């Protein structure tokens, strides 16, 4: 398990989603929740984002 923290610009780049879409999907339980890094800083665990991406790929390949 990786505890590497990804910041918002990298999460946007990896997912292809906008900031507002990421936060909307988080609110709807459709994207991993961010973790507080203190102050106004947040990040996402790399494993959580990787698992979400892998699931999206798997779902898109189902008939």
Residue ranges and their predicted role:
Residues 1-21, 51-56:
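Polyanion-binding surface elements
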Residues 14-43, 57:
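Major-groove DNA-recognition helix of helix-turn-helix-type DNA-binding domains
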Residues 2, 6, 39-40, 44:
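Residues at secondary-structure transition points
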Residues 1-2, 61-63:
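Intrinsically disordered, low-complexity and often Lys/Arg-enriched segments
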